Amino acid sequence: MHFENINLKTKNIMRQTLRDRNQHVIGYIDVEFSGRQCLRDSNNHVLGYYEPGRNQTVDSNYHVIGNGNLLTTLL
């Protein structure tokens, strides 16, 4: 698993690149300093969020998907 530090508009974010079995990029998980995670597709469109304080995954429209971190099910 590879993480890289990126600075998006002065936010400290760790980015994990998600790849398929052929090493093609299928998405990214950005982990904010607060612990909140944002799932983006390979075109950088937001697909959903994991809110660790509530232990819930929500889609890009903030509809609850379920309890726990279910981000990769949105890919």
Give residue spans per PLM region.
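Intrinsically disordered, low-complexity proline/glycine-rich segments
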Residues: 1-75
